[in-house]
Amino acid sequence: MSSENKKEPLLVITGPTATGKSEVGVLVAEKLGGEIISADSMLIYRGMDIGTAKPTSADRRGIPHHMIDIVEPDQDYNVALYRKQAMAVIKKVLERGNLPIVVGGTGLYIEALIRNYSFGGAGTDKTLRKKLQKEAAESPFLLHQRLAKIDPATASQLHPANTRRVIRALEVYYLTGKPISNFKRLDEPDPPFNLLMFGLTMEREALYRRIEKRVDRMIAMGLIEEVQNLLQRGFSPRLNSMRGLGYKEMISYLNGTLSLEEAVEVLKRNTRRFAKRQMTWFRRYKEIRWLKIENFADCEAIAQEIARCTEGVL
């Protein structure tokens, strides 16, 4: 950098699921000489491709993609580890003279990059955790509702079935009196990024139609077979990865709990609810410049607008 005070550029493209973030990100990267850093908590898993809508090699169009396929479905992973690894990747991208472009819809991952949070300072309480685990076993939805009352920002980002993270968020609150979403390291400044954030959005009904078509496409592409393969490889349905959208619903079909038609409808409903939670989370960000998809002819036009907005800024 030519000046000590100059901040390094960071471009973020986010928004709810099924809005075309991945395609737009690649097009922007082509225009600006960028590399993609995924901010999606499901794309980290190897072998989970169809249900996560993981960009294929063709989709990536030769653009480097990072933070994808980095762990097995049964490996533990958390936000703190994501931050450490993604920040190291961003540093290397900048050293190569390229623009780091963060693309994804996992709000906690994005938050971890643009804010300095202390993830371990709250400590743990084994007795409290066991109590919460027992309650979660009886009713994960009631536990999630409790979190929603004390920390709606975090609850909006977590599915009720993700009991491990729901329990951790409640544990932090009970130990500190503060929501985990408020945990910020005050002894150092925010990361030194010249930040530009864009959010893709569209009318709710149009988004829901997109979601339904996407689910139908996943089934046609072999989502059921993908889930069968994961189960045959020995990955437990109780893993956090296997509780992700698309996987838990197909497991319910495979074990006879739901018919295929029911499983597909439940997946569509759960994905719609997930998109709603994502929007609740992202509305907190004053930095986001929202781009309404209906106002553009296609993803290329959206990418052109984002590239135009970076001129003289990044």
Curated annotation (Swiss-Prot):
Entry's EC annotation: 2.5.1.75
Matching SUPFAM superfamilies: P-loop containing nucleoside triphosphate hydrolases
Reaction catalyzed: adenosine(37) in tRNA + dimethylallyl diphosphate = N(6)-dimethylallyladenosine(37) in tRNA + diphosphate
Binding site for ATP: 15-22
Annotated residues for binding of substrate: 17-22
UniProt keyword terms in alphabetical order: ATP-binding, Magnesium, Nucleotide-binding, Transferase, tRNA processing
Disulfide-bond pairs as recorded: none
Protein family (similarity comment): Belongs to the IPP transferase family.
Protein name listed in UniProt: tRNA dimethylallyltransferase
Gene: miaA
